[in-house]
Amino acid sequence: MNRIIVVTSGKGGVGKTTTTANLGAALARLGKKVVLIDADFGLRNLDLLLGLEQRIVYTAIDVLADECTIDKALVKDKRLPNLVLLPAAQNRSKDAINAEQMQSLVEQLKDKFDYIIIDCPAGIEAGFRNAVAPAQEAIIVTTPEMSAVRDADRVIGLLEAEDIGKISLIVNRLRPEMVQLNQMISVEDILDLLAVPLIGILPDDQKIIISTNKGEPLVMEEKLSVPGLAFQNIARRLEGQDIPFLDFMAAHNTLLNRIRRRLLGG
């Protein structure tokens, strides 16, 4: 049975599209057939993060206009045979497609893939409603900032109103040193505020920026970095595996203790 998941946030710039790209690649590496749908019409970026921007010929709009079949619009990733992208049109606004059309696209794909992952545009307007319409599950991406958490709370309420059966949370850009200084909200406090299950924690790491600029998802590295491992673990949890969370706070404390010992000559 396939799964249709929308990745959303409410607030822009929290790492939603980066999450979509890495989860798709990680699931493909686990042997799952995955299609990523870029639902951010007019502002598509998913193709860039996957390094597929030069291979786009048709988009979802062309499929809906009967200018091509959906198979022709799918962009294959030569590095990962199980991963394909259905790109958004870059020259259209977010209202270029409606909820029924989004459901039609998903209907054409659902018998061919194990996972259909929809990259939702930021905000809670028409683009959000369209992306959410065919989804069975949702992953909320937030950062440890009050504005992002408040927006995530609003989105959770909207998802529940749409009868989305399963909602999970990813906390991105965690900085343990700021949490310890009470300059950043802790993961525990975010969970208390949002009251949805946690599926992943990602550190604030420059490797994520480097990978997005290169168009190479972190999970495709031969030797996984810490954020790459965190993304891989999220994919494995989606598959039902019981994977412990990386303890970034403990790792930070261990580093501090090492520095103190060196300074004190211990």
Swiss-Prot record:
Name its cellular compartments.
Cell membrane
- Entry's Gene Ontology BP terms: cytokinesis, division site positioning; division septum assembly
Q: What is its main location?
A: membrane
Keyword Cell membrane assigned:
yes
Binding positions for ATP? K11, G12, G13, V14, G15, K16, T17, T18
Top-level taxonomic group? Bacteria
MF terms from GO for this chain are: ATP binding; ATP hydrolysis activity
Which topology term describes how it sits in the membrane?
Answer: Peripheral membrane protein
Keyword line: ATP-binding, Cell cycle, Cell division, Cell membrane, Membrane, Nucleotide-binding, Septation
Please verify whether the record's keywords include Cell division. yes
Identify this protein by name: Septum site-determining protein MinD
| Organism of this sequence | Synechocystis sp. (strain ATCC 27184 / PCC 6803 / Kazusa)
